[in-house]
């Protein structure tokens, strides 16, 4: 998968022959069950070598920029999202720095200047509730109208449901905040994970025969599940071990910071 860190950096690796793209766009936080339906459609449509698949996503999350008081937490770090998209088979990933200037693009400016002129769009595959353009005023019907105007196809994907409940990043965040890992993992389609660096603690566990490791999560926007005790599978280098994880403040040993 080729990774570009802005729209202006993007170019098709096609030996000088500009291929058209079949693309989708969004924040794709979690790359969950619903997202995968769209992403897999994109890859299926590019089995014909005339086209290349492309995902446009953004960092930081638009809500972090447009709602400065938002305390939204992310399901994925950038590295996690890249790995998940790569597993699906996406050929081109554009991670564009979202800022206020970008947010002021009108719907038509976005379509004409970016989708058509930069990405050479052949087809866009998008969720039914997608909104875009300044103040998110344009919807799927507007996108279809632009498709007719600029000669590209639009495929609309309906909401994906599990047990008659539509899957969304918001519902997964809620499940994690409630400590409902089973539901969160079902909606994600994989086990939620935390990645960090082991930091030295007070080493009290080893004195009673239960050595522990304190995990420092470096990305402060990563969602930490509800305080509690969880069964975990840990990957340390090439070694995988099972264990217990406590998220909380360790009041029995006067712990003052969350670990």
Where in this protein do the model-derived segments appear?
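Short acidic-hydrophobic, aromatic-tinged amphipathic segments that line or gate anion-handling sites
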Residues: 2-12, 94
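N-terminal catalytic cores of NTP/NDP-binding nucleotidyl/phosphoryl-transfer enzymes
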Residues: 12-77
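Residue-level signal for inorganic ion chemistry
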Residues: 32, 85, 124, 184, ...
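Glycine-rich, highly charged phosphate/nucleotide-binding loops
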Residues: 73-81, 105-111
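A glycine-rich helix N-cap at a beta->alpha junction
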Residues: 80-94
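Classical nucleotidyltransferase
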Residues: 104-211
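Phosphate/ribose-recognition catalytic cores of enzymes acting on nucleotide-derived substrates
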Residues: 201-259
